[in-house]
Structure formats: C-alpha cells, structure tokens
Amino acid sequence: MGTSARWALWLLLALCWAPRDSGATASGKKAKCDSSQFQCTNGRCITLLWKCDGDEDCTDGSDEKNCVKKTCAESDFVCKNGQCVPNRWQCDGDPDCEDGSDESPEQCHMRTCRINEISCGARSTQCIPESWRCDGENDCDNGEDEENCGNITCSADEFTCSSGRCVSRNFVCNGQDDCDDGSDELDCAPPTCGAHEFQCRTSSCIPLSWVCDDDADCSDQSDESLEQCGRQPVIHTKCPTSEIQCGSGECIHKKWRCDGDPDCKDGSDEVNCPSRTCRPDQFECEDGSCIHGSRQCNGIRDCVDGSDEVNCKNVNQCLGPGKFKCRSGECIDITKVCDQEQDCRDWSDEPLKECHINECLVNNGGCSHICKDLVIGYECDCAAGFELIDRKTCGDIDECQNPGICSQICINLKGGYKCECSRGYQMDLATGVCKAVGKEPSLIFTNRRDIRKIGLERKEYIQLVEQLRNTVALDADIAAQKLFWADLSQKAIFSASIDDKVGRHFKMIDNVYNPAAIAVDWVYKTIYWTDAASKTISVATLDGTKRKFLFNSDLREPASIAVDPLSGFVYWSDWGEPAKIEKAGMNGFDRRPLVTEDIQWPNGITLDLVKSRLYWLDSKLHMLSSVDLNGQDRRIVLKSLEFLAHPLALTIFEDRVYWIDGENEAVYGANKFTGSELATLVNNLNDAQDIIIYHELVQPSGKNWCEEDMENGGCEYLCLPAPQINDHSPKYTCSCPNGYNLEENGRECQSTSTPVTYSETKDVNTTDILRTSGLVPGGINVTTAVSEVSVPPKGTSAAWAILPLLLLVMAAVGGYLMWRNWQHKNMKSMNFDNPVYLKTTEEDLSIDIGRHSASVGHTYPAISVVSTDDDLA
C-alpha cells in the first residue's frame, strides 16, 4: 500500500472515530428541553414564558425559585394581587386579573368614555361608539343604546315602506318587491314607456335602440324575440372544443353535461339526458349524485344534501364512561368490573393487583394536574385550558388555532386566551364580534341595468347609478368616493362619483372585450381586470391613459380578481380546465398556484385582509371555502345546494360573508367562520353579477412608494407595486407597454426591434382576432394584442466578467479528474455489467429573478421568454 493510500485510510478512520455532537450533556444524558423551554429540577420541561410568572408549573416549584420581584410597566394595570395586565384590558368586560380587580365596579364606574363614545347608563360601566346608537342592534348590555330612537325618517327621494324601511323612489311600481312587504308595488298605474322607449312584456322600459341588437335587455328577452325582430338573435359566443354552449348563450365544460346538476342559466345542459345510475362501488345521494362508497358514514358530508351521513351507526359500541372493553374484545358494563365475577373471557375485568387500589394517593399518580382513580387503574386529567401531552403532563392549549374563536386578534395565554380587535374596530361585548367604528357599512351590487346600495344596519335600499346597459363587474376607490364598473355590452370600464346626484358617469377604459371582473388598487391608483375573450389579465391607470397585459398565457377562463396593494399581490380564479386559483406580484412577477385541488367552478374570490385569508365560491360544488394567503389551512365554510345554487360573487366585512346567487336572484349573508346565521338581504334581482362592501376600513391606507421620492417612481410608463416576499423585496418596479422592453436603467422603455404579431388565445373555432390600442412612451399609438414577446438586451460585458472565474473552476475540475484517474489505476475494482436506466423528464424553464437589498425603487432584470405555440383551449 502506498504512502498516500495509507494517509487516506488513516484520515477515514479518524473521521469515523471522531466524537459526534449528538446533543448529549457532559453527564452522557440527552438534554430533554429545547432552547424555548425551562427544565425543572425533576426533569420536566415547561415553556420558558412560565418561569417566574407567579404560578408553580413544575411540580417541585423550581420554576418560581430565585425570581426577581416583578414590577409592572407604565402601560400596565396593577391588579390587587400584584399581577400585571395591559391598561387597555381594564374595564373591557372581561376579567383578566386572577382576582378580577381590573373589572371592579369601583374602578370602572370612575371611567370616563372617550370622545365619540357614549355611556350605556349610570348603572353600567360600558362605553360604546356613538355610531352604534340606534343602529338596530343591542350593543349595551342593558339595551339602552336602542331606546328612544324614534321612527326612521326617509329622505325626499326615498319611499317609506309599510315596515318603515326606506327604498329609492325609483323602485316604486317597477314590478319588483323591493320593500319585501309589497308596499312599493301597491296602487300602481299601468306602466307606460316614453316615445323613444320599448316596453318589455314585464312592463319595464328600455331604450328603443337596444331592441333587436342581439343582446337581450328585457329580463324576459322580449326585445330580441322572433315576433319582435322577425329572426332569432345571433349568438356571437363560440365555445372552445372542450366546452358546450347553453341555450342561454354561455359556455360550460363538456363534462358537466348530464351530470345531474344544472349549470346553464336555462338548465339546458340537463335536458334530454339518459337516466343516471351509480356504479356498484358508489353511493347514490338523495339528489341523484354519486360519491365513492367509502365516503358513506365517514363523518363528513360528501353529498351536498348530507344523505351519506344519515342513519349511520357507530361501529364501536364500547364508548362512554359506563363501558369497559375487555382485552379479549367483549364490551361490558363498568359496574361488572372488580365484582369478583368473571365477565371477560380472559378475566381482564378482575385483575387481582389493580382492583380497589387508589393510585392517586401516591404522588398524585404522577399526574401534573388532576388524578382520577378508576375501578382498574387511574387516569390523568387537566384543568380548563390545558391538555395532556404525554398521558401525565399537562400543557397549555393554544386556543388561537381554532378558527373563529376570536373575531379578529387572538392572544394565547396560559390556560386561556384573549380576544382583541384591529384598529378601527371595537368589540361588541354582547356578541364578541369586532364591529367597525364610524359610518354605516353598506353593500353595493350590480343589477345589470343599475347599481344599488343597501345599508347593513338601517337597511336603507337605494339606487346609485341607473340607465346602464349590462353591468357585470364592480369595485370602488373608497377614499376617493368613486365607483368603477365594467359593461359587457359597451366593452368598456366606467366610473362615477358615489355622491353624484346628477347621474353622470365617464368612460375610463375602452376595448375591454369580455370583462369578467375588476379590482381597484386604492394605493397606487391602478385598476386590474380579467378578460374572458382575450384570456388575459390587464392593468391600467385609473384614468386609462396607460395600460398593458399583465398575463396572457396559461389562462383558460379567467374570472374573479382581487388585489392587496399593501403586500403587492394580485389573486384571480380560472374555471378553465384545470380550474385553479392563482396569485402573483402586482407587477407580473412571482406567479404561483394557490388552489388546484377539489375545485371546479371558482366564480368569485375576495380577500379578508384582517385575517389574511382568501374566500371563494365554487358554483359547481355549491361550496364556500377559504385558505390562508399561502394556499394552506383550507376550510369549508358552507356547502348548500339551496343557498349556493349558482353563486357568482362575494365580499367580506367584520364576521360576515355576503354573496350573490344568480339562480335565486338574491343576496345572502352568513358567518364567515361557520357558515351559520344565514340571512337573505335582497330578493328579486335581475341578473346581478358583482358585489362589494363600501366602508373605509375595507381599504386600509398604505404608502404609495411610486410617489415617495420621485413622480411615478421615475418610470417612463407604469409604476407597479412589487410583491413583498421578504424584507429585501423592492417596493415597486417599472413596466412598459406591450411590444416594449425596459432599458438597462430599469425605468425607460424601448421598442422591440422585431415587429410582433398579436392574437388572442383562441380555439380553432374562433374567427375573430382581438386587438387593442395602447398609449406608449412618446405618445405613439400602437396596435397591441394579447401575446407579448420580450427581447433581452444584448451585451458581452457580463460574459467577460465571469471568464476568469470560469477558467478557475475548469482548472479545479481538471485537477480533480487527474487525481481520480491516478487513484483508479492504483485500486483493485470489480465490474458489474448490469445496465442502469435513468428516467429523464423535461423540466420547465425556471428563471430566478435577482433582487437587490432594501432600496425603495428597484427593477427586475429583463427576462426573455419566447413562445411559438398557440395555447389551444
């Protein structure tokens, strides 16, 4: 053996015999507690926060030894027993001191209500926001806030219903019960239309120019009927080959045809279908749908009607405090244990050494809290707020892991928890709900030819914008008091002031071919929308002067969209095949899937920014679900064929979720955690499509980093927020119009050298090619389209910079190969001729976008992605 080989062998043996760090202590025993725990003298581990907290958590009391006397901070309230609690917890209706001194009448009666608050009476210690008085809800524990309120007086442009409710005068005698008691439709004269109007069979009036234009504007479609026009209306929609067209015009997936669930508005997908039968390995629900047989009686409602969990029997009959299970399998009554008679085949009910022995008398049975003596043996139990972690030791329960245990903020305490509210909200002590302080929140929703508003407290129901054509999408800039909506018939996005009594509205963005949804960025003052015809997601300034396609690939049926400018992310749903919900940076980077499983028709999505969750409606599964903003912690809120027959859009405020159902033509509300407390807010709608909450707390204020140091961030075209992935993420990036690339300075735009042909992502049956005109730097108008090809900047400086490093790496690799070849010649080897097959897969190109440190303004390096294949649906 050569000298080099012997040295290598000695080195190998030294490495093998070297002592390893296995976490052993000097005494050879493993440390039981980690860095976040305190080790008691008896070896037990407790959380470090429990040391010197005044409670003996170690059974030997070692956690309270050698403790420095604790003094409360200036921001704390000192309980009579010396305990410290935050000042804001004093007189909040919830005792936090162990002796209850923070809620003592002596302390709380001396309390003075703050500005914009009212007292609940001389005998009450409670203060509530002034805006909660006479809002229809008892917020004071004695109900004093709803006393002496008087009758609600409607304004001059409103009608007073028999119930006292106020509705818009435009709703009177319109053929719809808007009062919910029919009083707005009493004593109505036969409706007449003007000289330039057409009267539908339902008696409603539409402009004469809307008749026979192949777009049904009457709810009964009488303006496009064969009798009126002398021909059938021309349906312009052409469905992809993977979809079928309903009699009512819309497209649905082919696989939804004859599945027992009407998906078309007119139900034509379930006409002339063969009778359905379930396979032998399936269970047939009462509604006719089929589920796998293994899902029956599994404790989960898999059938929409819940019929799979009806008449289920518990196979384990040996449960409960009055039963004892023998080791031999029998189940006997607990009274037969230790009665000196054999009831179990194996005599396990009569163990000689265990009967009538109280193990709890010695060291509490080893239990850290409670020891319960049983007929045979014993069991440990814990005090409220704790749970067994090893059959003997009790640990704190983190109640904050339970969804909905607190309305907004949950603080886990030892043996309990504390609920708090976010800024701008105050807890209603009667319900535990964090209610908004300030103006009354309201729901605003589209009703095809108008936009309506209903107050959530006083239920005032009015018309905001009228004489519209076909409104399908809606959002608002609440701070600016502006509404934005998309009109399918006019292929445009409009805006209006919410307080405009004249009824003026303005066209902001044109050439929006089939808008599905819009989302307003209230911080950076842009608007995002999905287009179902061009299969794109676009962004534009609110005035419409600058716009571009943000995404134009891998979109099949883009639907709802929502933005969070505070974190720089945009979210959207796509009910194409496969259906999914995605998220990406609002600048078009860091695109990733959020929900891809158990999802079929995700129509509406909305963000709960307070709880950091995304909610969505699935019209096919008749389900309302939610996930956190990383796609984790998925929960089903509500599953209902009745209330979620064909849900279209939803919105969230406080502890309630509200949605529009197209089939029921109604607006519903429910608890956002449990799906309970279902309520109907509005009925008798006419093709309502979208809904939002209007309240200043829905759109929290944030900093517009594009206007922090220089106008528009120094960008020549669009300045868009970047996704805040970590502390080093840039705040914004510059973006160019379609057909232009960013220059190396990351701010200016230059035209691509090669002309680009643009066309929409389309099926082979589609004949029209959609194009749109966009304003580009220098005031040049170019015809742009859905696809975009980016050309990377040319240059060789980067290659010369890395050449020395490359040569060094090559030299090192060459030296290693020479050494291995020399070693191979000096070693005996054995060769096996068995072939080895490697599975290779073609991976998608992954591009890592470099980011610099925490500069406010920053741009991503240019990226080139060239696609030559059409994305056929």
Swiss-Prot record:
Glycosylation sites: 151, 765, 781
Compartments (UniProt record): Membrane; Membrane, Clathrin-coated pit
Tissue: Abundant in soleus, gastrocnemicus, heart muscle, placenta, brain, lung and white fat. Less in aorta, ovary, kidney, spleen, adrenal gland and thymus.
One GO process term, biological-process aspect: cell surface receptor signaling pathway
GO-annotated cellular components: apical part of cell; cell surface; clathrin-coated pit; extracellular space; glutamatergic synapse; membrane; perinuclear region of cytoplasm; plasma membrane
Disulfide bonds: 33-45, 40-58, 52-67, 72-84, 79-97, 91-108, 113-127, 120-140, 134-149, 154-166, 161-179, 173-188, 193-205, 200-218, 212-229, 239-251, 246-264, 258-273, 278-290, 285-303, 297-312, 318-331, 326-344, 338-355, 360-371, 367-380, 382-394, 400-410, 406-419, 421-434, 706-719, 715-734, 736-749
Processing after translation: Ubiquitinated at Lys-839 by MYLIP leading to degradation.
Short motif Endocytosis signal, span: 832-837
Region (Clustered O-linked oligosaccharides): 751-790
Cytoplasmic side: 820-873
Record bears the keyword Cell inner membrane: no
Site of covalent link Glycyl lysine isopeptide (Lys-Gly) (interchain with G-Cter in ubiquitin): 839
Domain of life: Eukaryota
Topology feature Extracellular, residues: 28-797
Transmembrane segments: 798-819
One GO MF term: apolipoprotein binding
Alphabetic keyword roster: Cholesterol metabolism, Coated pit, Disulfide bond, EGF-like domain, Endocytosis, Glycoprotein, Isopeptide bond, Lipid metabolism, Lipid transport, Membrane, Receptor, Repeat, Signal, Steroid metabolism, Sterol metabolism, Transmembrane, Transmembrane helix, Transport, Ubl conjugation, VLDL
Signal peptide per UniProt: 1-27
Main location: membrane
Positions of the LDL-receptor class A domain: 31-69, 70-110, 111-151, 152-190, 191-231, 237-275, 276-314, 316-355
Topological relation to the membrane, as annotated: Single-pass type I membrane protein
Function according to Swiss-Prot or TrEMBL: Multifunctional cell surface receptor that binds VLDL and transports it into cells by endocytosis and therefore plays an important role in energy metabolism. Also binds to a wide range of other molecules including Reelin/RELN or apolipoprotein E/APOE-containing ligands as well as clusterin/CLU. In the off-state of the pathway, forms homooligomers or heterooligomers with LRP8. Upon binding to ligands, homooligomers are rearranged to higher order receptor clusters that transmit the extracellular RELN signal to intracellular signaling processes by binding to DAB1.
Name of the featured protein: Very low-density lipoprotein receptor
Source species: Rattus norvegicus (Rat)
Origin organism lineage: Eukaryota, Metazoa, Chordata, Craniata, Vertebrata
Gene it is expressed from: Vldlr
